[in-house]
């Protein structure tokens, strides 16, 4: 259970309906490349003949590469971005992987994973390295981050084979093209500056946890972005609502931080303003952005009190469902 799941089903109707009713509408957005918001545009990176599993890989690896590009470019937040980007993979590596029987005789996995971390760090430090090699390393880190999925469906030797298997050429080539478009859209355009404030994968504790999980893609200079690498583009309330829900959770964190400054440790945006939300359609180089204050989507103290009430009402159930699945998989014996 997570924010995404909550918005797609009717189990927690009061929270879903609140977010849906207040999510900025299509007309509130502005595109960086078109006069009309969410207008169908020519695809700059063609989808091609790829399988669903390849599309999933492309989405995850491209998101990772976008953050690496930002970490390499900015000055102040370079290390913070890199560490946040790899936090989940490292947690699973140190926790689930090393404590599971799959680790036996899998020194190759450890070496492969640690080499991937070294390659991506060198890229961030602006060392000369071929982009395809960085993408292969990003794929390795993605597989460790996706460990719960892999350990659930593969036995020990199958896991080893799949973990060491390189990313196929079709995926690598598409991620390359998506990375080039991202660099043009965010870096070369001047949207991101050397001194930009960038926070990768911000979470919103304790409110993310109470909703069963919730981590945003990236925050850049007051705007919270969600990345989409699918071939379809258009306005969908639940996709926009997901980013808006993160804004709401951050508002709750900011409220908490007035009473307890340690909130900043688990909610990195609690001390920052989210002035707007945006969807980036990476195959089109299109950013659809909404300034929250201009469309009446900011929240009052009364709104926050209501949100706090309904989230707390469902918190135990959402947490239990999220944690029981993670614990079940981590404790599997192969």
Question: Where is each model-derived feature located?
Answer:
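Residue(s) in the substrate-gating loop at a strand-loop-helix junction
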Residues: 1-181
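Active-site metal-binding core of divalent-cation-utilizing nuclease and nuclease-like domains
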Residues: 192-219
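Metal-dependent nuclease catalytic regions and adjoining charged, substrate-binding loops involved
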Residues: 259-334
């Amino acid at each position: 259970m997570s924010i995404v799941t909550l918005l797609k089903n009717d189990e927690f109707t009061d929270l879903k309906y609140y977010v849906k009713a207040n999510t900025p509408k299509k007309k509130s957005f502005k595109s960086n490349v078109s006069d009309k918001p969410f207008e169908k545009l020519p695809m700059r990176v063609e989808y091609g003949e790829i399988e669903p599993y390849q599309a999933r890989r492309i989405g995850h690896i491209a998101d990772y590469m976008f953050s690496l590009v930002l970490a390499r470019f900015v000055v102040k937040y370079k290390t913070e971005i890199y560490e946040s980007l790899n936090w989940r993979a490292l947690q699973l590596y140190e926790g689930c992987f090393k404590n599971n029987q799959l680790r036996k005789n899998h020194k190759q996995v450890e070496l492969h994973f640690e080499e991937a971390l070294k390659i991506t760090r060198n890229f961030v430090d602006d060392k000369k390295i071929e982009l395809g090699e960085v993408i292969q390393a990003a794929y390795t880190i993605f597989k460790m981050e996706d460990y719960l999925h892999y350990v659930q469906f593969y036995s020990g030797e199958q896991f080893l084979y799949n973990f060491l298997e390189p990313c196929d050429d079709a995926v690598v080539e598409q991620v390359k093209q998506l990375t080039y478009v991202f660099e043009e859209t965010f870096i070369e355009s001047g949207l991101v500056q050397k001194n930009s404030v960038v926070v990768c994968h911000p979470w919103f504790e304790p409110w993310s946890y109470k909703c069963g999980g919730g981590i945003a893609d990236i925050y850049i200079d007051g705007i919270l972005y969600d990345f989409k690498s699918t071939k379809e583009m258009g306005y969908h309330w639940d996709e926009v609502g997901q980013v808006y829900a993160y804004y709401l959770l951050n508002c709750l964190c900011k409220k908490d931080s007035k009473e307890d400054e340690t909130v900043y440790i688990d909610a990195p945006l609690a001390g920052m303003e989210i002035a707007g939300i945006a969807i980036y359609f990476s195959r089109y180089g299109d950013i659809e952005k909404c300034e929250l204050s201009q469309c009446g989507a900011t929240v009052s103290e009364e709104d926050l009190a209501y949100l706090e009430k309904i989230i707390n009402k469902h918190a135990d159930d959402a947490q239990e469902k999220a944690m029981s699945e993670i614990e079940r998989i981590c404790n599997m014996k192969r």
